[in-house]
Amino acid sequence: MLSLTAHDIPWAAGATLLAWAAYKIGRILLLPYTSPLRGLPGPPASSWLFGNVNELMGTEDFALYSEWLEKYGPTMKLNSWFKIPKLFTIDTRAMNYVLSHSQEYPKPERSRHNLVQILGNGLVVAEGELHRRERRIMNPAFGPAQIRELTEIFVEKSQQLRDIWWNDVAIRGGSARIDIQSGLTKMTLDVIGLAGFNYEFNALNPDGKPNELNAAFEVMFEYLSNLRKSYWLIIRSRFPILRCIPDGYSRRTAAAHKVTRRIGLQLIAEKKAALKQMAQSGEKTAGTALKSRDLLTLLIKANTSPDIPEDQRLSDEDVLAQVPTFLVAGHETTSNATTWCLYALAQRLDVQRKLREELREVPVDNPSMDQLNALPYLDAVIRETMRLYPPVVAGIRIASKDDEIPLAVPYMDAHGRMHDTVRIDKGTTFPIPILGVNMSKALWGEDAREFKPERWESVPEAVQPIPGVWSNLMTFIGGPRACIGYRFSLVEMKALIFTLVRAFEFEMAVPIEDITRKIGLVQRPFVRSEMEKGTQMPLIVKQHVRL
């Protein structure tokens, strides 16, 4: 019988670790020859080490994917590191299958890790039973009735931004170059502060002091914006053992999380105290002792409702986790989409004029949600913006078991055989190509890459099976994990466009080809000739009417 001495243990442990590493590396190196995806059509790898990674990291929009999809069909194989095959499909039946089986297809651990750096452990990151509980409790706060109540905030803050730009443009003779993204980001931050927590960021106030919560989120966004261009962060996200190695990113994000935690706990304590005071004083109506329409108050109310069993309620930590989720999802995505909307309108002055004519027919400056939703061309412009410029361009899922994914469009393998399913192994990642589906010529026609709001007057039959929660688009995903706040975002965006396009004319300030985009959590605009200035969207803003 063999026995180990104290001297042998380190050697045995090292040998075991080496054998385990050799096994894992061997499996990875064999995947190009053993993966069930190897028979799928797709582009050749540019190199054995990088596969198609370098090509994809260098692309600014969906042009390269579109080229490949036209050549290889809606379901294809891409090559990751070491030529490992990766599934890529815009097949509507396949996406519907994966999105509707969210338990079997959760987010990969590395994606959840990256999102936690920005969003915390909130609804977007939660999986399984916790996600279902959070969703059930939070759903009422994002219903139509609640968004109707919040529309007043959307309009008031839109008008505040309008007045700031109006004064700025007036000082400069009625026309000025303005970085619209900066103002829109401040406006949507103010909105989510009030609508989300009844918290004043005062981001639009030019005399306001720097806000530490806003500064904390800028640090978190820095992490994600660097994720696509830093090989160290990519490798670190894939190998959890490397995350224990401290670096500048991890130190800054840890400090930022401390700030959000402290302020979040303070907000929750204030809401609970106010609700308790209301209950003790017997107040029944909202807005007497507390502006109870904000999302956090509604969440706390719902969580303490007698209709929710004790074992189904969220802990304070679970409620706290929603604070960064509300902030990021509630302001960065909407400001980004509105930025790209005005960019599109600056290129299509005919569309801008037609839209302004419709908006000018509304007899009030403070429209309700129902009045905004009753404007058909505004609705078409918003839909077309969300199609071409979705704030989040892709998602990802991972198979928790071996499976066969059904296809609407069969593919031919390398041996000439047709298949109407794709067989995948446990651990296979499944990208959700939001932008790819939204811009597919096979679904939307040859003009799929053009900004044409009129297309919404007669939507192609081919887009009907797209499994999105809203408007035959993948922008807000679909299934049990569809974006809970899509109504909030759409009405806020309509309020912004309504207010700004009635007051201003927008034109390009730089050549169209000088505008590029970089993808982090959202796709942010940059000016190629002014990259040192960071993200921006400069437009020429002109006064249209005297207010």
Swiss-Prot record:
Pathway where this protein functions: Secondary metabolite biosynthesis
CDD domains linked: CYP_FUM15-like
Sorted UniProt keywords: Glycoprotein, Heme, Iron, Membrane, Metal-binding, Monooxygenase, Oxidoreductase, Transmembrane, Transmembrane helix
Cell location: Membrane
Source superkingdom: Eukaryota
InterPro entries listed in its UniProt record: Cyt_P450 (IPR001128), Cyt_P450_E_grp-IV (IPR002403), Cyt_P450_sf (IPR036396), Cytochrome_P450_monoxygenase (IPR050121)
Entry's Gene Ontology molecular function annotations: heme binding; iron ion binding; monooxygenase activity; oxidoreductase activity, acting on paired donors, with incorporation or reduction of molecular oxygen
GO CC annotation, single: membrane
Pfam families, per database record: p450 (PF00067)
Known EC number: 1.-.-.-
Entry membrane topology: Single-pass membrane protein
Transmembrane segments: 9-25
Binding residue positions for heme: 483
Glycosylation sites: 336, 438
Function: Cytochrome P450 monooxygenase that is able to use 7-ethoxycoumarin and testosterone as substrates for oxidation.
Family named by the database record: Belongs to the cytochrome P450 family.
PANTHER family reported in the protein's UniProt record: CYTOCHROME P450, CYTOCHROME P450 12A4, MITOCHONDRIAL-RELATED
Protein name (Swiss-Prot/TrEMBL): Cytochrome P450 monooxygenase 128
